[in-house]
């Protein structure tokens, strides 16, 4: 292995090590004040069938995501089966539990490997660059949907959640993104545009530039596949169903704590658990949105980041003690982690045998 390749490997290793260390720090900050005897007692007395329902909602979201992605892939390669796309989604999510963001690239490889050959027989119809472009478009839709739901909730429920959003999200965001940062961002955008134009102008001068141009072109074809779908309304329905499942995942976990026997807990702890269990559907929607923000933190599987952000929101908005908020965060996160592990392992076996 050359020194250059070793340097790249070392940089990636450091990147993932820092990511894992950040997750450990956030987990420590989240659980350092937890009284483990009461924490375990609270988990034991919850209604586990509601937790299973949350896991099933998670699996349903994987399936709807696969069907939505299949619609984006159809203009590129209509022969890709729903099973293959579902397996790709599951394997990607499984990979993200260990290596953040890497799963998005892995699932593209699964699709390409199973794609039919092109007319010239030199590559697959769903080449890697085109599939990656569909993932870029899919994730862009997720961000737009999240922003739309967040704005709707803030407009209709500002009196309840506005203080938390302003103090914990808007002010830190505004403090980090001053004028200099926006100029830097604009400069990077212009640099990217200039780079693309340069590659296009010089595409016939060397094989390397020609290959790079081909990759960028394929990536763009994947992005614009969204506008070539015959049934765009189905894409929107699947998007709505995905976020409906996310909301159900949050609401069912709240239901799992409703009416539980808290006699084994201390008076203060049991009172806080009871307040937590009384939260309704709109609160579940807010917690879903807050939990989604944890994906911005580059840690494996959202470990630590999800727990800390959600417990902080429960403490700030509802006055629920942080250690009690951790119970909800743990049930929410770990139930979905188990669902991802089971589906990911099953899909990996399925792809290995195909």
Enumerate the language-model features and the residues they cover:
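Membrane-interface alpha-helices at helix entry/exit sites of multi-pass transporters
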Residues: 82-87, 104-105, 117-139, 143, ...
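Transmembrane alpha-helix interface/packing and boundary motifs in multi-pass membrane proteins
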Residues: 57, 91-100, 286-307
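Helix-loop junctions at the membrane interface of multi-pass solute transporters
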Residues: 74-76, 97, 108-123, 313-315
């Amino acid at each position: 292995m050359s020194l250059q390749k070793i340097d790249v490997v070392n940089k990636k290793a450091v990147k993932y090590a820092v990511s894992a260390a950040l997750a450990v720090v956030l987990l420590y900050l989240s659980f350092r004040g937890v009284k483990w005897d009461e924490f375990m007692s609270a988990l034991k007395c919850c209604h586990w069938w509601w937790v299973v329902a949350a896991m099933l909602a998670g699996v349903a979201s994987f399936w709807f995501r696969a069907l939505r992605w299949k619609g984006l892939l159809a203009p590129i390669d209509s022969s890709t089966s729903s099973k293959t796309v579902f397996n790709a989604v599951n394997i990607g999510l499984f990979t993200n539990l260990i290596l953040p963001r890497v799963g998005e690239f892995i699932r593209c490889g699964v699709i390409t490997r199973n794609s039919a050959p092109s007319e010239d027989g030199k590559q697959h119809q769903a080449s890697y660059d085109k599939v990656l472009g569909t993932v870029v478009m899919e994730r862009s839709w997720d961000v737009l949907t999240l922003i739309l739901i967040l704005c709707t909730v803030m407009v209709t429920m500002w009196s309840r959640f506005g203080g938390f959003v302003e103090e914990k999200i808007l002010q830190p965001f505004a403090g980090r993104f001053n004028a200099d940062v926006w100029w830097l961002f604009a400069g990077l955008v212009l640099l990217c545009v200039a780079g693309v134009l340069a590659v296009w102008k010089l595409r016939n001068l060397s094989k390397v530039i020609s290959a790079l141009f081909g990759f960028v072109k394929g990536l763009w074809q994947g992005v614009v596949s969204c506008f070539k779908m015959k049934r765009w309304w189905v894409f929107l329905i699947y998007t709505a169903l995905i976020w409906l499942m996310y909301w159900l995942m949050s609401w069912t976990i709240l239901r799992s704590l409703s009416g539980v026997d808290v006699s084994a807990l201390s008076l203060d702890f049991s009172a806080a658990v009871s307040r937590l269990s009384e939260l309704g559907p709109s609160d579940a929607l807010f917690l879903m949105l807050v939990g989604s923000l944890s994906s911005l933190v580059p840690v494996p599987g959202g470990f630590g980041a999800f727990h800390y952000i959600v417990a902080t929101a429960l403490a700030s908005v509802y006055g629920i003690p942080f250690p009690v908020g951790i119970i909800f965060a743990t049930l929410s996160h770990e139930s979905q982690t188990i669902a991802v592990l089971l589906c990911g392992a099953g899909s990996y076996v399925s792809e290995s045998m195909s």
